[in-house]
């Protein structure tokens, strides 16, 4: 009986540890900018990823990238590469890293870091007359939203 209780506790704690998202400050990029582990600890939802990619208040990926599967969304951009067939030459780990912080893969990229909270250049007083806030910012996307976008791109 005790063994069953202990086993159940181990399973509960192990499940909780897996489900805890990796915070932006804990993200580990490899030497090429890829992130090996899921940021949320859960699989992504491709349907929600498509919504995030077209939502102007969230990812808005189509503002810079053309995506044939999302043709219903207006105003596809041409700043970034087309995302059609990207799963043919990028892994989920590479896509996760690029979405989290593209500058870890492409140093001069103009793509925003969607899962970064610190390390930004803040001009402050010199340009606005107001001191720049020093606290961390909120990431543009959550860990699960990044996994959702990766799931969509891998379809």
Model feature map: region roles:
Residues 2-9:
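Sec-dependent signal peptide recognition
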Residues 14-16:
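N-terminal signal peptide c-region/cleavage motif recognized by signal peptidases
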Residues 21-56:
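Electrostatic cytochrome c docking/interface patches
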Residues 35-39, 82-85, 135-139:
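Second-shell loop/turn segments in exported
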Residues 43, 52, 66-104, 108-126:
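Gly/Gly-Pro-rich "capping" loops immediately C-terminal to redox-active cysteine motifs
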Residues 47-62, 72-77, 127, 136-144:
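Sequence context surrounding c-type heme c attachment/ligation sites in exported
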Residues 49, 57-68, 95, 149-153:
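The canonical Cys-X-X-Cys-His
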Residues 93, 97, 114-155:
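C-terminal capping alpha-helices of c-type cytochrome domains
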